[in-house]
Amino acid sequence: MSRKVLGIDIRNETVTAVLLQSSLREHRVEDFIHLPFSGPEDPERSLSSALQTLTEKMDLTGSDYVVSIPANQAIFRNLQIPFSNSKKIRMVLPFELETTLPYAAEDLVIDFHTLNGTPAGDQTELIAAAIEKSKLSPYMDALASIQADPEKLTLGGLPTALCLANQADPEEDQLFIEIDNTYGTLFVLVGNRLQLIRSFALPAAGPSKAPQLCAQIQQTLAAFLESSELNFEPIEVIANGIGLDETDIIPQLSRAL
């Protein structure tokens, strides 16, 4: 039985959609589109308007939706929880996070990704991600305007990072960096496991952007190495995003990392 899946990748200034036709025999890309948008102050170029254009360009009848939103909207924390049951973890995460965040737990949507595979024994290491409900609502409202109810909701760059980790040699470490015009997100891959996610603001295009990006990455890695017992020695840096269009980003990343 065939299935249509529409993947919608929402970034801060663009939305990209890929329509996948899936069956037992094959997975085939049927269509794709990449659209810019701006803020709500310009209704004709808003996210809702871009999504409406998407529905006009693609036949979405019967599609299931998988959606990602910008990773910089979330706050990430590495935690260790003294049990492995996922239901119990979900129950205690709001209380574990509330002491480290300037928000009330009831104002957040929280999820997690385990770092040590399937939890076993009495310890689970994880990355918790929390997003304010007030920041999530505009995305959900825009999706609702085209009757899109996501089957899965994730964060930009995370599926790619997990795919890279899944394909990696267990003995080889990597850095994956997503760069757009105003934010960067760093994914630390130790062997074939994701171990850290951090997002940070970047200045607009100009001579200070590349040095600040490199400084943020170096500071993040220094803090990670200080707090972790892992022996992290990346052999490869993979970068992606519209921010790479600036001519000095790649050379400076190469020199710094």
How should each PLM-predicted stretch be described?
Residues 51-64, 146, 220-236:
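Phosphate/pyrophosphate-binding loops at sites that engage ATP/ADP/AMP, CoA/4′-phosphopantetheine
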Residues 1-2, 48-59, 164-172, 224-225:
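Phosphate-interacting basic helix/loop segments used at nucleotide- and nucleic-acid interfaces
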Residues 232-256:
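Glycine-rich phosphate-binding loops at beta-strand->alpha-helix junctions
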Residues 30-57, 123, 204-224:
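N-terminal phosphate-binding loop and adjacent alpha-helix
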